[in-house]
């Protein structure tokens, strides 16, 4: 069953340049991952719609930052997949700039869901993504996708290995098993996203209340 968080999910906008990002007034959670790791399929599974986020058998097709609204001031942000060598160099360089700038400077961004194929986790580019984002001090949760491709015992062994690595190198980064085919892990991921949006919304409200309070304390010119 689809979590109530996604009941009113809808496409909001697509962006190819940092200057075109929508106003950062709400809470955003980014979805990032290597090309063909199952990022769009994971989003579709969470939302409960087969083609909500575009999926393709050709890696590198998600070339823009896509925003999906989950109700007022809540956004899932689908980032371009990285690591597809056949994309022209100029486009790859543009993606690097787009991704790194968004992840490191976006004030509305509360956390990142990092998608890794459970059969090929912690690639060089995955580690680079973690390094980029670790500098922000924001939350990271890893989805080890395509868990149905491994036996249960092997999947759990990989999960334990990745959890130990992250606890040592990136404290605060959490991880779970996920399968778009069987929906394993969808409920767990949905609960985490709900918590993040709630926490992020509370933080935004506190900042707004503080700003209003400061405005009231500041004397108007001429007083």
From Swiss-Prot:
GO BP term, example: division septum assembly
A Pfam family that the UniProt record links to this protein: MMR_HSR1
Recorded GO MF terms: GTP binding; metal ion binding
Natural source organism: Nitrosomonas eutropha (strain DSM 101675 / C91 / Nm57)
Record key words, sorted: Cell cycle, Cell division, GTP-binding, Magnesium, Metal-binding, Nucleotide-binding, Septation
Gene Ontology CC terms: cytosol
Binding site for GTP: 33-40, 60-64, 78-81, 145-148, 178-180
Protein's job: Necessary for normal cell division and for the maintenance of normal septation.
Cofactor: Mg(2+)
Ranges in a coiled coil: none
The EngB-type G domain, residue ranges: 25-199
PROSITE patterns (alphabetical): G_ENGB
Residues that coordinate or bind Mg(2+): 40, 62
Family per record: Belongs to the TRAFAC class TrmE-Era-EngA-EngB-Septin-like GTPase superfamily. EngB GTPase family.
Protein name: Probable GTP-binding protein EngB
Gene that this polypeptide is encoded by: engB
Origin: domain of life: Bacteria
């Amino acid at each position: 069953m689809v979590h109530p968080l996604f009941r009113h999910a809808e496409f909001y906008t697509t962006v190819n340049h940092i200057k075109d990002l929508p106003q950062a007034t709400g809470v955003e959670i980014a979805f990032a991952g290597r090309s063909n790791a199952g990022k769009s399929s994971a989003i579709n599974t969470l939302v409960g719609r087969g083609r909500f986020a575009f999926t393709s058998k050709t890696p590198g097709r998600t070339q823009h930052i896509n925003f999906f609204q989950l109700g007022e001031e809540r956004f899932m942000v689908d980032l371009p997949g990285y690591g597809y060598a056949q994309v022209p160099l100029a486009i790859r360089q543009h993606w690097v700039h787009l991704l790194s700038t968004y992840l490191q400077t976006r004030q509305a961004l509360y956390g990142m869901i990092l998608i890794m194929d459970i059969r090929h986790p912690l690639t060089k580019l995955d580690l680079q993504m973690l390094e980029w984002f670790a500098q922000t001090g924001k939350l990271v949760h890893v989805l080890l996708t395509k868990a149905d491709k491994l036996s249960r015992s092997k999947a759990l062994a990989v999960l334990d290995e990745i959890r130990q690595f992250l606890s040592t190198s990136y404290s605060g980064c959490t991880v779970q098993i996920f399968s778009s085919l069987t929906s394993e892990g969808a409920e767990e991921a949905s609960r985490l996203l709900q918590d993040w949006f709630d926490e992020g919304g509370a933080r935004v409200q506190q900042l707004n209340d503080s700003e209003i309070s400061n405005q009231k304390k500041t004397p108007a010119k001429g007083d």
